[in-house]
């Protein structure tokens, strides 16, 4: 589709951004997988674990399986002045949460320092199987202890207020201790993190400048490769050739090729709805690698998020399959924000199926949900990679509020799923108990190496 300037100005993207319009060229046509709402005979029980051990926690931006097969989560506190993030681990023996440490204490950057705080870990857990290390990097947004809010632009040159920088922590999951830490990104937060274990390299996207960084874990050195844009993608992924992939502001694939040592942009734009989108803001929100590592499944961070399957090892640029919208039908002439219209938590389970959480909300035309229930909810879907059929298997039930926004998902060594919740307090994580026929030991392997 070639979008003319006049057509774009009429669209919901707005006249102010008309010059951003780009042609929508994708690698494949949409597939016809039909959603199925009845989960059948297999029931998927859910459990809720609030962050009661960290009352200030207001978001959970990261959930990951560690190299030990256990589930780790970030209990973030970004709205309270002086708030800090705590590392949490699910304890399968007590069926509860263990609070391992407050990260500010590990990196000598206390919450009451007067600077912007080490308030969250944002899509930035990255495991290392060889030595049992779980890497994690912090993001910014938490205000100083005596300020109501924090602006990284306003405080960039203020040594008393400026965020010290993303703290990179190496946590030994065998010894339960932090073995070292470093400043990964001075003055900036880490939006997302990836670990190339073979080459001992960490890759990160910075905020607010949206630069692409490489950190050598052996030499403890960092390198700024360059700027991608203004809208951070929310994840990175790695292919068999050790190339790192993400997206730019306009929905193009961006890759870093170590052999060429440069950032490259695809000639096409990722799938989106051409009725009211042109690719702008169609950045990756979440990506999960298929078990054979030949393809990845991705969801975009935009109202009406799109699901897609990408084959990064094929051709000069990957083949991209458009799997269609992740969320329900709606009136495209009416705005809907990305907190309500959302898809996240992509994770492959031991049964070889893709699971993810997509929001659903009350709509008088497209989804007339009962008035007696919540006006929105988070639905756990199972997608069959062979047929691309989607099946609803569970709904996440928060005791006091809707739970439509899931940040990340993970599978533990027992084969059960965990999802991070973002909303109002109390926040925490959900556990989805897979039926015995779909669980297997060490279901987390091969392990996910990006946040």
Predicted regions and their residues:
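Short, conserved, GDST-rich strand-edge loop motifs in beta-rich repeat architectures
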Residues: 76-82, 136-163, 358-375
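Surface loop/turn motifs at the tips and blade-to-blade linkers of beta-strand repeat domains
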Residues: 51-55, 102-104, 114-117, 182-186, ...
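Conserved beta-propeller blade signature
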Residues: 71-72, 134-135, 201-204, 243-245, ...
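Repeated scaffold domains used in trafficking and secretory/extracellular systems
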Residues: 58-61, 109-125, 188-194, 231-237, ...
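Beta-strand-rich domains and repeat architectures in extracellular enzymes and scaffolds
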Residues: 50-83
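Loop/turn-rich, solvent-exposed surfaces of beta-rich toroidal or solenoidal domains
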Residues: 298-299, 334-382
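N-terminal export signals
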Residues: 7-28
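Blade-level signature of beta-propeller repeat domains, shared across WD40, Kelch, NHL, RCC1
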Residues: 404-451
């Amino acid at each position: 589709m070639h979008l003319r300037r006049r057509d774009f100005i009429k669209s919901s993207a707005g006249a102010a951004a008309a010059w951003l319009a780009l042609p929508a060229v994708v690698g494949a046509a949409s597939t016809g997988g039909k959603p199925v709402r009845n989960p059948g005979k297999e029931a998927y029980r859910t459990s809720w674990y609030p962050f009661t051990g960290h009352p200030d926690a207001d978001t959970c931006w990261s959930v990951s399986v560690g190299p030990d097969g256990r589930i780790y989560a970030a209990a973030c506190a970004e709205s309270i002045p002086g708030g800090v993030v705590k590392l949490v681990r699910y304890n399968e023996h007590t069926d509860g949460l263990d609070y391992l440490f407050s990260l500010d204490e590990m990196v000598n950057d206390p919450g009451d320092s007067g600077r912007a705080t080490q308030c969250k870990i944002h899509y930035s857990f990255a495991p290392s199987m060889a030595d049992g290390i779980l890497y994690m990097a912090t993001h910014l947004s938490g205000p100083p202890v005596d300020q109501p809010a924090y602006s990284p632009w306003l405080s960039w040159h203020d040594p008393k207020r400026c965020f010290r920088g993303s703290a990179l922590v190496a946590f030994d999951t065998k010894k339960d201790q932090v073995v070292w830490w470093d400043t990964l990104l001075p003055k900036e937060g880490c939006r997302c993190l990836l670990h190339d274990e073979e080459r001992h390299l960490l890759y990160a996207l910075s905020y607010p400048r949206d630069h692409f960084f490489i950190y050598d874990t052996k030499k403890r050195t960092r390198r700024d490769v360059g700027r991608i844009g203004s809208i951070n993608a929310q994840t990175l992924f790695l292919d068999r050739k050790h190339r790192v992939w993400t997206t730019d502001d306009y929905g193009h694939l961006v890759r870093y090729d170590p052999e060429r040592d440069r950032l490259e942009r695809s000639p096409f734009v990722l799938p989106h709805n051409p009725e009211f989108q042109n690719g702008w803001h169609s950045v990756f929100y979440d990506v999960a690698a298929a078990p054979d590592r030949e393809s990845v499944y991705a969801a975009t961070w935009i109202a009406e998020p799109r699901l897609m399957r990408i084959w990064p090892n094929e051709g000069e640029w990957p083949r991209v399959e458009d799997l269609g919208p992740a969320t329900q039908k709606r009136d495209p002439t009416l705005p809907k924000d990305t907190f309500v219209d959302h898809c996240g938590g992509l994770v492959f389970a031991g049964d070889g199926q893709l699971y993810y959480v997509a929001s659903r909300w009350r709509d008088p035309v497209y989804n007339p949900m009962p008035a007696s229930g919540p006006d929105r909810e988070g639905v756990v879907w199972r997608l069959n990679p062979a047929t691309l059929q989607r099946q609803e298997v569970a709904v996440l039930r928060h005791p006091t509020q809707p739970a439509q926004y899931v940040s990340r998902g993970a599978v533990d060594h027992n084969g059960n799923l965990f999802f991070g919740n973002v909303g109002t307090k109390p926040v925490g994580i959900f556990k989805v108990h897979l039926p015995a026929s779909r669980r297997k030991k060490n279901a987390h392997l091969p392990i996910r190496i990006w946040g």
